Amino acid sequence: MNTLPEWTDLRFFLELARAGTLSSAARRLAVEHTTVARRIDRLEAQLGTTLFDRSREGYELTELGAALRPHAEAMEGAALAAAEHVKGADVAAHGVVRLGVPEVFGVRVVAPLMARLLENNPDLSIDLLALPRFANLANREADLGVMLDPPTTGRYMVTRLASFRFYLYAAPAYLARHPPITQQSDLVRHDFVDYVQDRLASSELSYLNELGFTPRRRLCCSGMSGQLEAAALGMGLMMAPPYAVPHDGRLVQVLDGFYAERAFWLVAPADLYRLRRVRLVWDLLRTYADSQPALFQHGPASR
């Protein structure tokens, strides 16, 4: 190899590694798919190795391609940090931050928080990905994300955002039509609203397993927003954290003292964490979660 690879070729390499197909990578880069293919061919020829296995399903990194990826991502992070510094990021955060969050948490907690952040940072923009799953940070779907399962491999900054509890809730009309609930064993006679079990975004969402019996799931939804509406319409009991339940009386807590406890983790790729705009969102989420324990648990924070 007589010359070093061009950074732009490595950028095309990263986008194809993340997207998996030429067309998806081309959309991210705002170029034709033939341009992506040509850049990858040039990079492979320059390095004298095959970086991707090609198939009808798309492009998958070879072993050597996977070995190159963290080096290319480190270069990407350095380029982003350099651009921020040159543009005066030491004075004010600017640019776009893509934040991946669970859907209800994103709508009810994070969106109002981002509105206040943007008022104080006129050069900052937020892409809020409020999803019924967790953002794929490995493919750079988001710059940082809130999730139940922190990554165990790769270069990430990870911190516990908050411990939270799922409590039992039901509509008053449902409770009026069904046998009373005074102890946990009474729950076996009731209907439940839950996630679609073969579409769980995380095994941590199988909290109904902690009931001690197999619940009678009358309606299952892929996201919590659908569950909240179904439970409010009297279709069964559901479990949810305090921040998810509207204070409009449509749902009331059942069986005080029973809950399932989980933790949210805040995660960002290590190279993106260095960016001022990403750290600004990171620090805001950390500070807000610490200051609002009632969003996550009823009563004292410890058992």
Where are these regions (language model features)?
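The DNA-contacting recognition helix of HTH DNA-binding domains
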Residues: 33-34, 107
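Short helix-boundary/capping micro-motifs
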Residues: 15-30
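Residues within the DNA-recognition helix of helix-turn-helix
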Residues: 32, 39-42, 113
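Conserved amphipathic alpha-helical core elements
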Residues: 43-44, 251
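Alpha-helical linker/hinge and terminal dimerization helices associated
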Residues: 10, 46-47, 64, 68-90, ...
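A short LG(V/I)-centered, amphipathic sequence patch enriched
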Residues: 44-61
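Central regulatory/effector-binding core of bacterial HTH transcription factors
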Residues: 94-154, 303
